Amino acid sequence: MWVKLQAVSLSSILSHLIISISLVGVAPRCYDTGNFTTNSTYGRNRDLLLDSLPRNASANGGFITATIGQGSDKVYALAMCKGDSTPEKCFSLVNDTIHELMDTCPNQKEAYSWTGDFSVVHYADHSFFGTLELEPSVAVYNTGNVTSNLTEFDTVWESLINSVVRKASNGSSSLKYATGEAELGAFQRIYSLVQCTPDLSEQRCDSCLRQSASRYESCCHGKQGGVVQRPNCYFRWEMYPFYTANASTTASLSPPPSPSSPPPPAASPPPNSVDSEIRKGKYRSARCMLISGIK
C-alpha cells in the first residue's frame, strides 16, 4: 500500500492536522501562464510537435527535446522515458501521456505530465531546456515499515542513494540514469533507481535528486519504499527488484555491514506501476494540510 503526499500551507498557523482524502491518480498539470485559441498557429504547432514526440523519443534512446514555429507561436517540448524502457514501451508510454495531457489541458500554453512508469512530457511557449524545476512534485511511499535495525538500515540506504545519485549525475547528455542494490544484512536487499532529464547539468541533476531524497527522508523515514517525481528527476527505492538491471547503468557500491538480526518478513511484491496501483485502489492518498484555529 502506498500514500501520496502533497503539501499545502495556510498563514497564521496555530495548530496542525493531517487530513486524509480520497484515492487519486497522478494527473497532468495545466499551467495558468496563458491560453491559446482553437485552430490558432500556436495550437497547430503544439499538436504537430506533440504528435512527433513518441516516435522521436523512442528512436533517440528515450529522450528528446524539440521546437517548432517562430516568435510567439514557437513551441518547446520535451519527452523522456524511464531508462530501462524498451523503444516499444517508450513509444506507448509517451503516446498515452500526450493524449491524457491534451485531454486535460486542451488550450493551455504550458502543461506537464508524468505517469507512474515515469514517462515525462512537458511543453511550453518558452524555453525550459536545462532549467531545474522542482515543482510540481509528488511523493508516494509504501506504508509498510522497515523491520531491520534502523541505524544499520540508514547507513546502507544512504550509501546506496549516494552511489546512484553520483552515477546518474555523471551521465551523458543523452542519459542521466542509474540503478543499484545493496545488501541489508544476510536476508534483504535495497533497490534504487534515479533519473534526470539529460538536458540538466551534472550539478543540477545532483541537486534535484538529493532534494528528492531529502523530501522522502523528511516525510517517510522508516517506510519500505518510496517515489518522488519532479519535472526534471525521478527518485525511487524499494525492498524488491522493480527495474531491468544493466551493467552500464549500475552504480558501484561499498561492501554492506554484517547482518545483525534474523530475517524479517518479505516486502510487498512489486506493483505493475505506481500509477496503475493508484487506479486499482491499492494506494491511499493523503494531503498534508496545515490548518489554523483548530482547538
Name these PLM-found stretches.
Residues 2-295:
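Extracellular secretory-pathway ectodomains and N-terminal mature segments of eukaryotic proteins
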